[in-house]
């Protein structure tokens, strides 16, 4: 088969099965569209052909986020195709898809961060000690290292190197990465591990999971959402911590590819949305503060 999509999909060792399935569907849609325009082999795909396809998707009223996802699949395919010699060039170079669906990832405001991390609401001040230590450690880790919810819930005691202040994270597609720990995260984690966690465990329910619920079982994504609901001033999605982490890194001058590595993104396009978030925030600051804005 000229497109050799099965070989491409087999090469995707750093993505989940669900992502690979989406790539397969998006590639097949592109191949079928290309055939209708008399383009039957990947070598015949030009940059103009890609642009025409994206324009066609827009005319068909596909959501901007869907177009961005389809573009990501094409980028990865043609990068692979050029590397193994299926094509002589990469027609997706300099091709950019529309970002998002009009709504950018939510970034927590400084006051929200302060309430969540430094001065919890009065209603949670009377929590029992162990749960408070756990919640503090969870929130510091979410904001300080930008972990996904699934990644945080999967952490074990062996995930950490406190001598180097690093955490080993198992991300999408079982891809491992090392992420630095903030000083406040280290302090909160040490308090939880030494003082809080033992209170939740007994000999009958001893295991390696770092975070556990009141029954001594591993913390679940649902448990984590409830934890955040108790601390937040307004409804807050756990993923907002990851968005805030990435945006604050870029605001502080971090390189885009460094942020990509810290987040565990397989494709740089997934990280680029945060540059857009940063630009939008700068525009709002300018509009709100400059007398001639």
Describe the function of each predicted region.
Residues 1-293:
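Conserved catalytic core of the tyrosine transesterase superfamily
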């Amino acid at each position: 088969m000229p497109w050799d999509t099965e070989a491409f999909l087999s090469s995707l060792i750093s993505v989940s099965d669900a992502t690979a399935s989406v790539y397969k569907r998006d590639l097949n849609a592109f191949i079928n569209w290309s055939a209708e325009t008399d383009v039957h082999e990947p070598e015949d795909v030009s940059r103009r052909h890609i642009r025409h396809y994206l324009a066609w998707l827009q005319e068909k009223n596909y959501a901007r986020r869907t177009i961005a996802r389809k573009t990501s699949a094409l980028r990865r395919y043609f990068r692979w195709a050029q590397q193994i010699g299926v094509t002589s060039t990469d027609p997706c170079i300099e091709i950019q898809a529309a970002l998002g669906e009009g709504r950018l990832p939510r970034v927590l405001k400084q006051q929200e961060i302060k309430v969540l991390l430094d001065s919890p609401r009065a209603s949670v001040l009377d929590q029992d000690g162990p749960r408070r230590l756990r919640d503090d450690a969870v929130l510091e880790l979410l904001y300080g290292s930008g972990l996904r919810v699934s990644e945080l819930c999967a952490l074990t005691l062996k995930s950490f190197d406190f001598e180097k202040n690093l955490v080993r994270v198992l991300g999408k597609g079982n891809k491992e990465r090392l992420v630095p720990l903030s000083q406040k995260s280290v302090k909160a984690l040490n308090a939880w591990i030494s003082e809080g966690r033992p209170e939740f465990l007994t000999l009958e329910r001893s295991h390696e999971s770092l975070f556990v619920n009141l029954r001594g079982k591993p913390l679940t994504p649902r448990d984590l959402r409830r934890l955040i609901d108790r601390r937040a001033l307004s409804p807050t999605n756990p993923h907002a911590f990851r968005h805030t982490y990435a945006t604050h890194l870029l605001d502080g001058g971090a390189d885009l590819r460094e942020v990509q590595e810290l987040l565990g993104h397989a494709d740089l396009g997934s990280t680029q949305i945060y540059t857009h978030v940063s630009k939008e925030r700068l525009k709002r600051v300018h509009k709100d503060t400059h007398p001639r804005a």
